[in-house]
Amino acid sequence: MKNFFRKTCLAVATGALLLAGAGAANAATITIVNADGANEGFNDPTPVLPVGGNTGTTLGQQRLIAFQFAADVWGALLPSAVEIRVTASFDPLTCTTTTAVLGSAGPRTYSADFANAPLAATWYPAALANKLSGVDLNPGAMNSTADDLRAQFNVSLGGATCLPGSGWYLGLDGNAGSSINLVVVLMHEFGHGLGFISLVNNSTGALFSSKRDVYSNFLYDNTVGMLWPDMTSTQRVASAINPGNVAFTGQWATWNADNWLGYASELLVSAPAGVAGSYNVGDAGFGPTVASTPVTGQVVLAIDDTAPTSDACSALQNAAALSGKIAMVDRGTCAFAVKVQAAQDAGAIGVIVVNNVAGAPSSMGGSGPAVTIPSVMISQADGVTLKAALASGLTATIHSSATKRAGADPLGRPLVYTPNPLQSGSSVSHFDTSAMPNLLMEPAINSDLDPD
């Protein structure tokens, strides 16, 4: 549990919820309000065996225990004297045999210009507004809009028409195996409901009801040197698709980033002098980490026998030239792990993948259990520059930076997720996927989030 608390701290700080410092005396009480009907969801009477520390004897009980467990983790970190209520239910959500909406959570209401509000004309989600004001600003009955969060999760998961073979893991120990860890998804979605959410329309740049929101108030675009509230709508639209250049400027978030994020991977070119310097990279989700397996060597373009001949998707023709070198390959045609494996089989000690679209380099997903060499991606523009220097004896090191944090800007502020093109439901209201270790509020579940 200690590590999971640490992984959650940065999300808390960024959500502006840790304004006074959390402590046992101030811990928030988060109450799960059961909105399910008889014999469904939390009230499902199906008998089950205890699993992973979850002692419930029915399916409904285990679901509720998992919900309350996640709520208690958040509550231990949040200083609030006002009870936080979560309207919660299990419902059939959008689902196919290959994709599914796992669940969602968000604030039920927002408040602005209340007593003790730190910023005027600024929307605050219900739980945060109540904490700051010291009173419940919207009192009322349970299971109504007087509750602070609304959470819905997919009751159909694992069924014949909804990601068959998956299903929710209801244990509290992180040992989900091939199932989907409900506690991890709950922690993420509760984060949105507690304040990790932008109210700006990312497609139009418009503010919500003509007011700024507390989350977006801290977004800073390093390209134009402006905070989001000071931008025009047109500028905000552009900023929402400015990958790697939008940071969260909150003091607590920056402090936690420096204490939690690891050092970023980088490509350091030492020769020829005309292109020497540090280049930003995207990491691979397979093979060894760059930090554990740094390599230095001459860079050689991989050549295969099928056009396009530099993507390493068919038999390599220059294996001898690649042996003991760092291979450069182009993105496209086949999976990242296939390219890296081909270079490794030819004797390469590392791989540089050149992006095939404009913009920042992305992370490389996929599975490569036999891959033992490090690999990184560089941008398309940097690829053009470095390819032009290959004939001059391009020499580089793939390693971890000594100064730059993974997932942070040059000032150490955590980056938010602003891919191009825009990803509805994911852009802006998540941390950037370049963070290492991965963070709770990234747009996808990852192995770093087990509540260990």
Language-model segments: residues:
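Active-site alpha-helical elements of protease catalytic centers
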Residues: 181-194, 339-351
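Bacterial Sec-dependent signal peptides at the C-terminal "C-region" and cleavage site
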Residues: 20-26
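N-terminal secretory signal peptides that target proteins for export/translocation
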Residues: 1-6
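Structured lumen-facing ectodomains of secretory-pathway proteins
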Residues: 254-422
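Short alpha-helical segments and helix-capping/turn motifs at coil-helix boundaries
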Residues: 14, 67-73, 335-341
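Bacterial N-terminal signal peptides
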Residues: 11-20
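Extracellular zinc-dependent metalloprotease catalytic-domain scaffold
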Residues: 27-187, 193-265, 391-452
